Amino acid sequence: MNYDFSRELRLLTPEDYKSVFKQAHRAGSPHFTILARENSLSHPRLGLAVPKKQIKTAVGRNKFKRITRESFRNKQHSLPAKDFVVIAKKSAQELSNEDFNKLLDKLWHRLSRPSRG
């Protein structure tokens, strides 16, 4: 199994993001929200939205992105073929790395279940 985070596993264009924002299933916490939408590919893809308004410092934004990408990279083979967008909230920077990963795992699992309706 390959655990890299190649270009094909990323949302790259504004159209990709728009389609997820338009019709998405949500899983959220006080620290961040994950939006998910089925895609027509055979693998999941990840997009990140980390506004400067929410996390002020570049160090904080980069940490958020790094931890989220690493979690996605490790879980990619157990995730369904969906496009995921992770949106940061202010309180995300207060989480320890361990708590951040636990919360991400919980939300990945919630979004991996078949949708009802």
From Swiss-Prot:
Top-tier EC class: hydrolase
Keywords noted in UniProt: Endonuclease, Hydrolase, Nuclease, RNA-binding, tRNA processing
Keyword RNA-binding: yes
EC number: 3.1.26.5
Reaction catalyzed: Endonucleolytic cleavage of RNA, removing 5'-extranucleotides from tRNA precursor
Record GO biological process: tRNA 5'-leader removal
RNA-binding listed as a keyword: yes
Top-level lineage group: Bacteria
GO cellular component terms listed in the entry, alphabetical order: ribonuclease P complex
Any one GO MF annotation of this record: ribonuclease P activity
InterPro entries membership: Ribosomal_Su5_D2-typ_SF, Ribsml_uS5_D2-typ_fold_subgr, RNase_P, RNase_P_CS
Pfam families: Ribonuclease_P (PF00825)
PROSITE patterns: RIBONUCLEASE_P (PS00648)
General function of this protein: RNaseP catalyzes the removal of the 5'-leader sequence from pre-tRNA to produce the mature 5'-terminus. It can also cleave other RNA substrates such as 4.5S RNA. The protein component plays an auxiliary but essential role in vivo by binding to the 5'-leader sequence and broadening the substrate specificity of the ribozyme.
Database matches in PANTHER family: RIBONUCLEASE P PROTEIN COMPONENT
UniProt record similarity statement: Belongs to the RnpA family.
Subunit structure: Consists of a catalytic RNA component (M1 or rnpB) and a protein subunit.
NCBIfam families recorded: rnpA (TIGR00188)
HAMAP family registered for this protein in UniProt: RNase_P (MF_00227)
Protein name: Ribonuclease P protein component
Gene: rnpA
